[in-house]
Design a protein with these regions (language model features):
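Glycine-rich anion-binding loops and their surrounding alpha/beta cores
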Residues: 1-148
Length: 148
C-alpha cells in the first residue's frame, strides 16, 4: 500500500461477522499510505441501535432478497435496516478514503455518522430501491443475453 499510495478499510464485528455489526463493537483498520490506524466503534456511538444477534440472522436466498428489497424500499426498520445503514456508510467512507486519502485526518466516527445520514437519505428518498431495480434489470438482461 505504501508504495502505491493506496488506502483501505478492513473491518470486523466482535461477534465474528466480516462486516460492521449492530450487536456490539466492531474493529476497523484504516490503511493510508502504509500507516495503519485501528478504531473500535459501537453502533450507539454512530446513531444506530444495538441488537441481539438473532435479529440479524438471515434465511433462504429468496427470504433474504425480500428483506433486502423491503429495507431498500424503506419498508423495514430495526436491526436489519441499521446494519445495512452501517455497512453502506462503511462503503462510502472507503470510497471517500480511496479518492481522498486526506479524509483520514477526520475522526472515523464522524465520517461514519455523516455517511449513515447519506445512506438513510438514499433509502428514505427511494433512490436505493430504484438503484436495486436497475441492477436487477441489467443482471436479467445480461443473463438472457448469455443464454441466447
Amino acid at each position: 500500500f505504501q508504495t502505491r499510495g493506496a488506502a483501505a478499510l478492513v473491518f470486523r464485528g466482535d461477534d465474528g461477522l466480516d462486516e460492521l455489526t449492530v450487536t456490539g463493537y466492531s474493529r476497523i483498520w484504516e490503511v493510508v499510505n502504509g500507516d495503519v490506524g485501528e478504531h473500535d466503534v459501537h453502533p450507539r456511538d454512530l446513531g444506530v441501535g444495538e441488537y441481539e444477534p438473532k435479529e440479524i440472522l438471515g434465511g433462504s436466498p429468496a427470504h433474504n432478497a425480500q428483506i433486502a428489497r423491503e429495507v431498500l424500499a424503506g419498508e423495514r426498520d430495526g436491526a436489519v435496516r441499521d446494519i445495512v445503514l452501517l455497512n453502506a456508510a462503511a462503503g462510502l467512507v472507503a470510497y471517500e478514503l480511496a479518492t481522498n486519502p486526506e479524509s483520514a485526518e477526520r475522526p472515523i466516527r464522524q465520517r461514519l455518522v455523516e455517511q449513515i445520514d447519506v445512506a438513510r437519505a438514499s433509502i428514505d428518498s427511494g433512490a436505493a430501491a430504484e438503484k436495486l431495480e436497475q441492477v436487477v434489470t441489467v443482471s436479467q438482461q445480461l443473463h438472457a443475453n448469455s443464454e441466447a
